[in-house]
Regions:
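Short amphipathic alpha-helix with an adjacent loop that forms part of the alpha/beta core around
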Residues: 181-191
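Glycine-rich phosphate-binding loop and adjacent beta-alpha segment
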Residues: 204-274, 307
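C-terminal capping/lid region of NAD(P)-dependent oxidoreductase domains
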Residues: 271-280, 288-307
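Glycine-rich helix-loop-beta junction characteristic of Rossmann-like nucleotide cofactor-binding loops
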Residues: 118-123, 189-190, 212
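Mid-domain Rossmann-like dinucleotide-binding core that forms the NAD(H)/NADP(H) cofactor-binding site
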Residues: 104-178
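Glycine-rich beta-strand-centered segment in the early N-terminal region that forms part
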Residues: 4-21, 31-72
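NAD(P)H dinucleotide-binding glycine-rich loop of Rossmann-like/cofactor-binding domains
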Residues: 59, 69-132
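Short glycine-centered segments of the SAM/dcSAM-binding site in methyltransferase folds
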Residues: 65, 127, 151, 218-219, ...
């Protein structure tokens, strides 16, 4: 349907969108009942050009190419539209060398990955297990861990995802559908285990703790779980091996933590250090088909609407 063009308020900018990224969480939000608002424009991530600024925002920002984050977090108006109004900080400069489609891949996947890397601490010379290393988040996390000097072991559930993880820099990728992950990790680390785990699904990966895949005093970073609620955890392993369990929700980072993530990410983007994967593009009028493609589970990278 048609909406009137929004106008920015104090401290806000209006972005003329050229691309809208669709994450699995956007599909989940769409399916959730009851809906949070009577009328919703979906999607948190996108990229475009600032064309209008509100009071308190410098006029130098007009014309800037930007990528945006959390557009539809706790508010109804996301990026599957022509214009979005956001607080100024949520529109981050996009390097000229990057396309708008690539910029629309960044918000949730790249910020989740960089926050995971920061929580893992110094990674130089260490070994990291990245579950789902061929996923949108895992692909970025693998690249970033390698940039920080780590050796990455990844997991993947298909040949295509394995190939993506290897291209991201993983030195070994375990097909978790064909090979028991725990014994293989111990084999690859000569029985020592890894220094850190960056995990997309706590409900399935937490069981590996009792197999000692994570070294004593290691760090386990959890950014998601296919099953939530009460889950079994081997507390004895956590306690007696002094495991540091760190969980976070990328939508709800503390301001200083998010600023640090954006600063780190922006440096890599300016230097052209990261690969970006656009799985497939659709037109805005094809939003339904785009969501169905995400739901199919066959995407490699981020599905993007071109606006």
């Amino acid at each position: 349907g048609e909406l009137s063009d929004p106008e920015p308020g104090i401290g806000e900018v209006r972005v003329k969108l050229h691309a809208s990224g669709i994450n699995p969480s956007d599909v989940k939000f769409r399916l959730r009942r009851p809906l949070d608002f009577e009328q919703i424009v979906p999607h948190s991530d996108g990229a475009g050009t600032i064309d209008y600024v509100g009071p308190g925002v410098g006029s130098h920002r007009v014309g800037q190419r930007v990528w945006v984050w959390n557009a539809q977090w706790r508010r109804p108006w996301g990026t599957a539209c022509e214009y979005v109004v956001l607080p100024e900080a949520q529109a981050v400069p996009l390097p000229d060398a990057m396309s708008f489609e690539q910029g629309a891949c960044l918000g949730i996947p790249a910020l989740t990955a960089v926050r995971s890397i920061q929580l893992a601490g110094s990674l130089a010379g260490k070994t990291v297990l990245v579950t789902g290393a061929g996923s949108a988040v895992g692909h970025y996390a693998t690249q970033m861990a390698v940039l920080e000097g780590a050796r990455v072991i990844g997991t993947a559930g298909s040949g295509a995802r394995r190939e993506d993880a290897e291209q991201a820099g993983a030195f070994s990728v375990i097909d978790y559908k064909q090979t028991a992950v725990g014994p293989r990790v111990l084999e690859l680390t000569q029985g020592a285990g890894v220094d850190a785990v960056i995990d997309m699904d706590f409900s399935s990966t937490a069981a590996l703790l009792s197999e000692n895949v994570l070294k004593a005093h290691g760090v386990y970073i959890c950014y998601g779980s296919n099953t939530t609620g009460i889950l079994p955890v081997d507390l004895k392993t956590l306690l007696w091996r002094s495991i540091d369990l760190r969980c976070f929700l990328v939508y709800d980072l503390l301001p200083d933590d998010r600023a640090a993530c954006i600063e780190k990410l922006s440096g890599w983007l300016e230097q052209g250090r990261l690969q970006h994967r656009v799985a497939k593009t659709f037109r805005l009028r094809q939003t339904v088909a785009a969501h169905e493609f995400v739901e199919s589970g066959s995407k490699r990278g981020t599905v993007v609407l071109r606006i």
